[in-house]
Curated annotation (Swiss-Prot):
Keyword presence, ATP-binding: no
Primary gene name: ACBD4
Gene Ontology MF annotations: fatty-acyl-CoA binding
Region (Disordered): 150-175, 195-226, 248-269
BP-aspect Gene Ontology terms: fatty acid metabolic process
Name listed for the protein in its UniProt record: Acyl-CoA-binding domain-containing protein 4
Residues bearing PTM Phosphoserine: S166, S171
Annotated an acyl-CoA binding sites: 23-32, 43-47, 69, 88
UniProt keyword terms in alphabetical order: Lipid-binding, Phosphoprotein
Length: 269
C-alpha cells in the first residue's frame, strides 16, 4: 500500500523540474514575461518545495524586495513539499494558457513554444497552442500534435535531479542567490519604489535608498566627494587680500622734561 501512495511522487518531481527549467530559460526579451505577482508565486512554491516552510527571519525595511519575497513564501505556512510542487505545476499551466490566450500567434516567432517542450513531454494535460499554429512548424511540434511525444529527443536544458538543500545550509542573505525563479529584481526593480512613493507621496532619496543609485546620481555624488577636501582652500582663495603694514611707533605722550610735580618742581630736577 505504501508503494502505491509513493508512486505519483517521481512523476510530480519530474514535472516540477521541467517547469522550473522552463521558467529559468524564458528569454528576457521574449514575447512573454511573467508578471511580478506570477514570479512571486513561482518563488514561494519553489522555496516551499525545496526548503520546506519559511523559518528564516524577515528582511529589514532596507530590503523591500526581500520582504515581498519573504511574505510570499511565509504565506504558504506548513504546506508540504509535494503540495508546493503540484501548485508550481498548476501555476505553470496557467502561465502557458495565458500565453496562448493573450499573445497573438501570428506575431510571435514559431520557435516560441519550444521553451515549453519539456512540459509537453511530461505533463499530459499541458495547454497547447492551436494545431493550425503547430502545423506551420516542423520538428517536435508535429510529433506533439500526432501524439508521438516519446519520439521527441530529450531537451538538453533539463536540470539534473538535485537533492533538496537543507535549511541549515542557507543563511538569510543566501535566499537571493538561487538561480531558479529568483529574478524579481531583474523583472521590475522600480515597482516597489513606485508603490512606496504612491503611498507616502514622497520622492526617493538616493542617499537613503537601498536600491543602487543611477549612473547620473553616482557621478554627482562622486563629484561632490572629490570637491569636499578643496572646499576650505577654495573659500580662502575668495577672501580679499589683506595688506600687511609695518607697525609705526606711537609718539611719546609727553617729554619727561616737561612733566612737573603738582608742587611745580620739575621731575627732571
Amino acid at each position: 500500500m505504501g508503494t502505491e501512495k509513493e508512486s505519483p511522487e517521481p512523476d510530480c518531481q519530474k514535472q516540477f523540474q521541467a517547469a522550473v527549467s522552463v521558467i529559468q530559460n524564458l528569454p528576457k526579451n521574449g514575447s512573454y514575461r511573467p508578471s511580478y505577482e506570477e514570479m512571486l508565486r513561482f518563488y514561494s512554491y519553489y522555496k516551499q518545495a525545496t526548503m520546506g516552510p519559511c523559518l528564516v527571519p524577515r528582511p529589514g525595511f532596507w530590503d523591500p524586495i526581500g520582504r515581498y519575497k519573504w511574505d510570499a513564501w511565509n504565506s504558504l505556512g506548513k504546506m508540504s513539499r509535494e503540495e508546493a510542487m503540484s501548485a508550481y505545476i498548476t501555476e505553470m499551466k496557467l502561465v502557458a494558457q495565458k500565453v496562448i490566450d493573450t499573445v497573438p500567434l501570428g506575431e510571435v516567432a514559431e520557435d516560441m513554444f519550444a521553451y515549453f517542450e519539456p512540459l509537453y513531454q511530461v505533463i499530459p494535460d499541458m495547454p497547447r497552442p492551436p494545431e493550425t499554429f503547430l502545423r506551420r512548424v516542423t520538428g517536435w511540434k508535429e510529433q506533439v500534435v500526432n501524439g508521438d511525444v516519446g519520439a521527441v529527443s530529450e531537451p538538453p536544458c533539463l536540470p539534473k535531479e538535485p537533492a533538496p538543500p537543507s535549511p541549515e545550509s542557507h543563511s538569510p542573505r543566501d535566499l537571493d542567490s538561487e538561480v531558479f525563479c529568483d529574478s524579481l529584481e531583474q523583472l521590475e526593480p522600480e515597482l516597489v519604489w513606485t508603490e512606496q512613493r504612491a503611498a507616502s507621496g514622497e520622492k526617493r532619496d538616493p542617499r537613503n535608498s537601498p536600491v543602487p543609485p543611477t549612473e547620473k546620481e553616482a557621478a554627482a555624488q562622486a563629484q561632490c566627494s572629490a570637491m569636499a577636501p578643496w572646499a576650505p582652500r577654495a573659500r580662502a582663495a575668495l577672501l580679499p587680500p589683506v595688506a600687511l603694514r609695518r607697525p609705526v611707533a606711537l609718539p611719546n605722550v609727553s617729554d619727561p622734561k616737561e612733566v612737573t610735580v603738582s608742587g611745580g618742581v620739575s621731575a627732571a630736577n
